[in-house]
Amino acid sequence: LPNNRRLSAQIWRAAVGRVPLLLLDSDVTGNDDAARGITDRLYGGGGDHRLQQELLLGMGGVKALRVYERLTGSPAPEVFHTNEGHAGFLGVERIRELMDNGMGWEEALTATRANTVFTTHTPVPAGIDRFDQSQIRHFFSAGLAQSVPTDKVLALGAESYDGGDPGKFNMAVMGLRLAQRANGVAKLHGKVSREMFSGLWPGFDVSEVPITSVTNGVHVPSWIDPEVTQLAREKFGVATVHDRDWNRAYEISDRDLWDLR
């Protein structure tokens, strides 16, 4: 980090069914007080605090995967999914790995894009993380990814399109530039995203902007309380939550709904 500071993180492994979930924790001995607080909240931090969270998540996340591969013998990921711009720096870390092994910038960028996908969740520009270009330069000039030219990193997130702010570094823009494929999280959201990011594809009609959509979904039995399912069975005689006519929900009295609490 700048000013000869270091940021270390402990890796916690949680088992989600058969899927290992790796979590990064900066509250460890050896970090200064500011660094220990980087992972103290999910949202709400601003300025350098938020930037350091996203550097840790993206670049530190790739490093954590490499440690996990080495310790467990797990295969290396074949595809990296950047779920919103928060983890966008994972692409920079992967480019650094390739450049450290002799690739040039363009070759490393192409290789990284080839197996990276990006999902945007945000339907309004105000919801996207943006930093001053000077902040990004300050951190990367300190040697975060020594083999990667800082100007190349800055160009990835530059709002270099009509209506953009040349002084800002946009995490979603970087995510899109580092990905082979991109999607929104609903059909309408895909349309909104194509409009919102159309400046990245000058000369394309909005309908041709290469952002598709994958509709969010949930595993219904996991997310619906058994008491709600039982109420549906009692009121409508349905065998499972999949036998549904949502319009009949209006037949349930307010009292029955309050009693579920």
Task: Name the predicted role of every residue range.
Residues 1-261:
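Catalytic cores of carbohydrate-active enzymes across secretory and cytosolic contexts
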